[in-house]
């Protein structure tokens, strides 16, 4: 996802990014103030009675199947017309109608507003397309580098499948937070210095927290507080980031597998509504992985029992969305088939549990209200 480094002049923003360049990772630097909109949107050319957009030369620096970094330096010197042209480059990753290679990362740098001379404030739409990070050099680090030299930066790698699973894990937790704080979905750009909350920046946050977790920066480790705070603030703004991280650290949730295997009986009265929502979303994720497994039948028993307890506790509305999501898969059909294969007695028990849930009068009333 695109990153914007904010720092005073001379602190090494450009040097660091350009220092990442090697044969497999070309870095192309474009200084915003010396380019016009067509350098980012393409130049319209009439050809055979039709207008096409000629691709700027800098795009050729990147191969179709290779990695690279597009570095947009001095971004705050870009006039509004150039900023508008950059919107598509930064978020849609297209120069005119020409897509950037998938391996190209987009990084920008800018001076803080109080240090800008003759610059332009970034428009809210452009700001919202970046993760914003403050960049500075502590004195002790600079002094150390004078005698020992600068360490070369490295780009960490994260396995895509592992990230997809971890992303889902944090998406359910963020969904739980937004159930408690629905107004946090959006924030006023004018009330935040750089990043501000929007559905897009919440997507960024989930992806970054998932990546951080895989790289060892875990939510409940106090040593990682500053790293996670900087990343969340860069997406959402400081106030929302503080609330989110506090929520994530204080979640009281049992391991979903322990619940599904019957090793843990969930104390419903100790869980608030957001925690119960997150728990059921996590249980769903595990059950959906077992649709073709022999574990589906024994694991569904505790799930149905817990859902029944939540209904009796008057919390149908809390688990309605996760329950509906699971029911929209082949879960019920496969569960009934496995129950039938297990014999008449087991089939009767499973059928009774399912019918009890989905014929519940309170659930029907809740659905009617939603309709």
Could you describe each region identified by the protein language model?
Residues 154-313:
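Alpha-helical lid/collar subdomain of P-loop NTPases
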Residues 266-371:
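Terminal-proximal interaction/regulatory segments of ATP-powered molecular machines
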Residues 8, 50-52, 57, 88, ...:
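Arginine residue identity/basic-tract feature
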Residues 6, 40, 53-59, 120, ...:
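Bulky hydrophobic/aromatic packing residues
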Residues 1-172:
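AAA+ P-loop NTPase catalytic core and its hallmark functional loops
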Residues 14-15, 33, 41, 76, ...:
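Generic serine detector
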Residues 16, 40, 62, 71, ...:
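Phenylalanine-focused residue identity feature
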């Amino acid at each position: 996802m695109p990153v914007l480094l904010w720092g005073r002049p001379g602190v090494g923003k450009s040097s660091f990014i350009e220092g990442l360049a090697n044969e497999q990772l070309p870095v192309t630097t474009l200084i915003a103030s010396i380019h016009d909109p067509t350098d980012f949107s393409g130049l319209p050319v009439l050809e055979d009675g039709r207008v096409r957009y000629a691709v700027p030369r800098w795009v050729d620096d990147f191969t179709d199947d290779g990695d690279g970094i597009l570095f947009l330096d001095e971004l705050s010197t870009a006039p509004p017309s150039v900023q508008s042209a950059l919107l598509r480059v930064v978020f849609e990753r297209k120069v005119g109608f020409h897509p950037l290679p998938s391996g190209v990362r987009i990084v920008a740098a800018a001076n803080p507003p109080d240090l800008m001379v003759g610059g332009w404030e970034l428009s809210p739409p452009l700001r919202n397309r970046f993760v914003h990070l403050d960049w500075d050099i502590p004195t002790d680090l600079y002094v150390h580098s004078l005698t020992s030299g600068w360490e070369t930066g490295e780009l960490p790698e994260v396995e895509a499948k592992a990230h997809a699973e971890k992303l889902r894990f944090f998406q359910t937790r963020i969904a739980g937070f937004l159930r408690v704080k629905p107004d946090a979905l959006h924030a006023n750009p004018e009330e935040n210095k750089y990043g501000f909350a929007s559905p897009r920046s919440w997507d960024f946050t989930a992806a970054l927290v998932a990546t951080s977790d895989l790289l060892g920066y875990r939510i409940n480790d106090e040593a990682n507080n500053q790293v996670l705070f900087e990343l969340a603030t860069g997406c959402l703004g400081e106030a929302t980031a503080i609330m989110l991280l506090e929520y994530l650290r204080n979640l009281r949730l049992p391991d979903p597998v322990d619940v599904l295997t019957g090793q843990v009986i969930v104390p419903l009265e100790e869980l608030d509504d957001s925690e119960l929502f997150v728990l059921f979303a996590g249980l769903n994720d595990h059950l959906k992985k077992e649709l073709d497994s022999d574990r589906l039948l024994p694991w569904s028993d505790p799930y149905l029992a817990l859902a029944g307890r939540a209904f009796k506790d008057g919390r149908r509305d809390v688990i309605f969305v996760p329950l509906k999501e699971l029911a929209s898969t082949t879960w019920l059909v496969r569960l009934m088939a496995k129950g039938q294969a297990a014999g008449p007695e087991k089939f009767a028990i499973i059928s009774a549990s399912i019918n009890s849930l989905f014929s519940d009068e309170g659930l029907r009333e809740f659905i009617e209200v939603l309709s």
